[in-house]
Amino acid sequence: MKNRLLLKEFQEKVKLFAQELVNKVSERFPETSVRVITETPRSVLVIVNPGDGDQISHLKLDFDGLVEAQRVYGVL
């Protein structure tokens, strides 16, 4: 299947995803910031703050090469 990612591809795409996400959000909220926290090589948190609190996405590369994405609610 073409959509399965290798570890290096996942890590590169996470950076692109974070940049595209902050670009999109900052269209409405110019002071938006983004942080990427690597929990493990296969698991990252992408934290976007448009100025009124963090919006957290957890991205995980499964061993089958597919990516699982979850929104995280709460405070880190």
Swiss-Prot record:
This is Uncharacterized 8.7 kDa protein in cd-pseT intergenic region. InterPro entries: DUF7320. Pfam families: DUF7320.
